[in-house]
Design a protein with these regions (language model features):
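Ligand-binding pockets and gating/stacking loops
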Residues: 1-120
Length: 120
């Protein structure tokens, strides 16, 4: 209900197309329990939900294997997600760098590409 309320509120105020909503965690969860105390982290299969300005609604990109263990169809990296978010915000992700150990690094590394399937 909170996300639906946010979207409804943004639309009623005419702000939905000016806001990018990003919902995701820093990792997924394994589809099975490794121990009796719950499921462990899974960096090979996780979900991201995007809405608002610049996003084509109702689009699904990629899928996990039949067990939900790892991305199997059209996998995307976190670098690609970051590149897409920065692109929608109007920033050139290839020029955004930071200095680390005397070397300029890109925020999206060399793997960052815009996920064009989600763009409106």
């Amino acid at each position: 209900k909170p996300l639906a309320g946010l979207i409804k509120d943004l639309k009623s105020r005419g702000m939905f197309d000016d806001v990018l909503i990003v919902w995701h965690g820093e990792f997924g969860r394994l589809p099975i329990s490794e121990r009796m105390d719950g499921r462990d982290h899974n960096n090979k299969g996780f979900s991201v939900w995007l809405a608002g300005g610049g996003i084509k609604g109702g689009t699904v990109v990629g899928a996990t294997d039949q067990y939900g263990y790892a991305a199997a169809d059209n996998p995307k990296s976190v670098y690609e997600l970051h590149a897409t978010i920065l692109h929608i915000l109007g920033l050139d992700f290839e020029k955004l760098t930071y200095r680390f150990n005397g070397r300029d690094m890109r925020l999206t590394d060399v793997h960052g590409r815009v996920i064009k399937e989600v763009l409106a």
